[in-house]
């Protein structure tokens, strides 16, 4: 025999007007806040990722690709100096 926890059923919740009044405001506002977070560039600043125009600088236009098998440490040091 199962007991009653006193909680409302899911169907009862999503058919109530109160649910839709609350969520018709919060869901679009979360979408707009996320869009503004990304479109203003604040996401780049918060997470520290480079902006699309900062991947390649004027001095370094090539891809930092390690080609040597035995001198890879020297190439890594060279790449890290260019940053």
Swiss-Prot record:
List the transmembrane segments: 21-35
Q: Which Gene3D superfamilies match?
A: Photosystem II cytochrome b559, alpha subunit
Q: Which InterPro entries does this chain map to?
A: PSII_cyt_b559_asu, PSII_cyt_b559_asu_sf, PSII_cyt_b559_CS, PSII_cyt_b559_N, PSII_cytb559_asu_lum
Please provide the Gene Ontology terms (biological process) for this protein. Answer: photosynthetic electron transport chain
| Gene Ontology molecular-function annotations | electron transfer activity; heme binding; iron ion binding
Q: Where does heme bind?
A: 23
Q: Which cofactor does it need?
A: heme b
Q: Where in the cell is it found?
A: Plastid membrane
| Cytoplasm listed as a keyword | no
A GO cellular component annotation in the UniProt record = plastid membrane
State the SUPFAM superfamilies in the record: Cytochrome b559 subunits
The family line of this record is:
Belongs to the PsbE/PsbF family.
Quaternary arrangement and interactors, per the entry? Heterodimer of an alpha subunit and a beta subunit. PSII is composed of 1 copy each of membrane proteins PsbA, PsbB, PsbC, PsbD, PsbE, PsbF, PsbH, PsbI, PsbJ, PsbK, PsbL, PsbM, PsbT, PsbX, PsbY, PsbZ, Psb30/Ycf12, at least 3 peripheral proteins of the oxygen-evolving complex and a large number of cofactors. It forms dimeric complexes.
Q: Which UniProt keywords apply?
A: Electron transport, Heme, Iron, Membrane, Metal-binding, Photosynthesis, Photosystem II, Plastid, Transmembrane, Transmembrane helix, Transport
Q: How is the co-factor bound, per the entry?
A: With its partner (PsbF) binds heme. PSII binds additional chlorophylls, carotenoids and specific lipids.
Q: How does it sit in the membrane?
A: Single-pass membrane protein
Q: Has UniProt tagged this entry with the keyword 4Fe-4S?
A: no
Instruction: From the Swiss-Prot or TrEMBL record, give the protein name.
Output: Cytochrome b559 subunit alpha
Q: What does this protein do?
A: This b-type cytochrome is tightly associated with the reaction center of photosystem II (PSII). PSII is a light-driven water:plastoquinone oxidoreductase that uses light energy to abstract electrons from H(2)O, generating O(2) and a proton gradient subsequently used for ATP formation. It consists of a core antenna complex that captures photons, and an electron transfer chain that converts photonic excitation into a charge separation.
